[in-house]
């Protein structure tokens, strides 16, 4: 699972995900990628699941780049606990994805049909709507 080594603050406000992404909207390393269409929170377990799905579909060939990292803590109070008495403990970590952000990339030494298949399988595992992008289209 992806968890930051150090964090400036233990807990953060909930906040809102507004606007489009400022950076990370183009392919930098590979030739095929997964780009978000809508805003949402991607948990560290989603990132790990997608990494495993892509690597299994590609049969360990090619290279995968994960372009995001979960850096926002999400706190939760236990069940059967009354309101008040402070904020709950950190439950998991998320990446707040804005529309237009590239999440994953795959190298060009994989055939396009196989890369598209792997990334379409990965789309089903993510909580945000995504689309397949490539340098060749």
Swiss-Prot record:
Belongs to the universal ribosomal protein uL16 family. Pfam families: Ribosomal_L16. Binds 23S rRNA and is also seen to make contacts with the A and possibly P site tRNAs. Keywords: Ribonucleoprotein, Ribosomal protein, RNA-binding, rRNA-binding, tRNA-binding. Part of the 50S ribosomal subunit. One of its GO terms (molecular function) is structural constituent of ribosome. GO terms for cellular component: cytosolic large ribosomal subunit. GO terms for biological process: translation. InterPro entries: Ribosomal_uL16, Ribosomal_uL16_bact-type, Ribosomal_uL16_CS, Ribosomal_uL16_dom, Ribosomal_uL16_sf. Signal peptide: none annotated. This is Large ribosomal subunit protein uL16. PROSITE patterns: RIBOSOMAL_L16_1, RIBOSOMAL_L16_2.
């Amino acid at each position: 699972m992806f968890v930051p080594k150090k964090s400036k603050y233990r807990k953060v406000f909930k906040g809102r995900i507004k606007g489009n992404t400022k950076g990370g909207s183009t392919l930098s390393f590979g030739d095929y990628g997964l780009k978000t269409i809508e805003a949402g929170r991607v948990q560290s377990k989603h990132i790990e699941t997608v990494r495993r799905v892509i690597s299994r579909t590609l049969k360990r060939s090619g290279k995968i780049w994960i372009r995001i990292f979960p850096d926002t803590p999400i706190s939760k109070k236990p069940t059967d606990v009354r309101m008040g008495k402070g904020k709950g403990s950190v439950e998991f970590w998320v990446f707040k994805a804005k529309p237009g952000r590239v999440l994953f990339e795959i190298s060009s030494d994989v055939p396009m049909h196989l890369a598209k298949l792997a990334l379409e399988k990965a789309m089903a595992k993510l909580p945000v709507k995504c689309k397949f992008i490539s340098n060749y289209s």
